[in-house]
Amino acid sequence: MLHEFTFKSYNKIDDIQAWIYVPACEPKGIIQIIHGFGEHSRRYLYMITDLMDEGYIVTADDHVGHGKTAIINDRWGDWGDEGFHTMMEDEHALMQIVKEKYPNLPYMLFGHSMGSFIARDFMAKYGNELTAVTLCGTSGVWPDLEESINKLKQLVAEGKGKESDPA
């Protein structure tokens, strides 16, 4: 079963587009997907289907400035002044909506890329409300970072690539 709905963003401007996917069997838990930069949550439909087949309720939304949220608000790429904090609070609002509808189930977050950073902030503030968190495509140590930066600067200075920005 699919529930599609909107809720008011923390920024009090946007309406956030959200979905709850419910399996046909008795659910064993809830997984909230937090997508990355420039993405939308429907990019994860194959994963959502697999998780539902395993008995999980899955929920997701499109962040401010992203996907269907951007379409319905006509605000592409506009996160506002507190965009990152807004996205984290919107994820918490979604969690509250889902927990009210489906109480007493284990609640997990899956954050990909930028979504993993949102999930980290979420854990810092609301971690006691979670059972587990998966961080995917997140940052880590880059041992040759300085060398890579210098190589990229050189390529930009030479005007290599389709786009270069000397600033």
Language-model features and meaning:
Residues 34, 61-63, 136:
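Alpha/beta-hydrolase
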Residues 41-43, 50-74:
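Conserved alpha/beta-hydrolase
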Residues 79-99:
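Alpha/beta-hydrolase active-site loop
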